[in-house]
Amino acid sequence: MKRSPFRRSRTRGAAAVEFALVLMPMIVLATGVAEFGRAIYQYETLTKATRDAARYLSIWLPTDSAYPVSAAQCLVVYGSTTCGSAGTELVPGLTTSMVTICDASHTTGCGDASDPSQFSNLPTYDANNNAASGTATGAINVVEVKVKGYTYQPIPAYPGLMSITFGNIITVMRQVS
């Protein structure tokens, strides 16, 4: 019995075509996931930077003549209390003008709905579950560090993807008084 010569199948190359059809949506999906992760990373970096600056300012009296507002702004932007041309921003596009410091003595730019109603002489209450119906036992001062108007710029892999402006990123901590 004689075998017929090898015949090429009609399905030859079908896997390559299927792979090509699936590859582009998979690349777009993977890049989108990476871009979303990058946005979350930048948001968390800003949150941690405001926390560091609020912690730094919490040991200073707001009435101190050496109160380091500009150093705290540099701490948010550069991760260091000194601003310099050699420093790189923690996140691209962040400037010290986007950082607002609010406390008992500095209230410019502190009138947003997300801000506390007051920064000095906040009453503290007894052990009645911190309810305002308890007896006031003292007062504290707070300091707020806020990043306002930061715009996240996506990587240029998506030409149609628009930039995102984050909401106010705020940290409030108790301050010495």
Segments the model singles out, each with a brief description of its role:
Residues 2-78:
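Alpha-helical assembly-interface signal, strongest on the long, hydrophobic N-terminal helix that forms
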Residues 2-3, 51-177:
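Short, conserved structural patches
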